[in-house]
């Protein structure tokens, strides 16, 4: 049986997470707590062979990946399609500030976020399409070449990848909230995908 594994890791905490702000494309570093979270995930995955590492362009994913496997020993494949959604003029603002400054756009977003865009930001359909394209490519690679691939990305991105792999609509992404300081594992066995671990917080032992 051919088995491919995807280890999905959300980056550690940033100041934007800590302060409850809308942000995606803003390139924030990890907080001290975020560094500790990344170290915890690295410990959970220390005994797993990892063949390929994929990250976004944003430093918080690279900083997290560096705890899991050092760049001196593993090449990082940086894919801009794995970047978090760009929230335009809403970046680094609290929802209460956004509602006050952009009331019409905020109301549109709240009523139909699946088809709307933040002020000056990325429309959700465009965001979903680029992430789903990566998910499709990875699924095809998994069927052809068995390997263990680590993906360090963002909450929205990882949720969309999971829903794509399991044939769910994009809005189901919120049913798979990948948490910081944890990891998830999707396995492709002879072309059939399963979710083996979700938000795991203990050492991972693969089942052959």
Please provide the spans of the model-predicted regions.
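Acidic, low-complexity terminal tails and accessory targeting/binding regions
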Residues: 1-4, 77, 88-97, 144-147, ...
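Short, hydrophobic/glycine-enriched beta-strand segments
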Residues: 5-11, 151
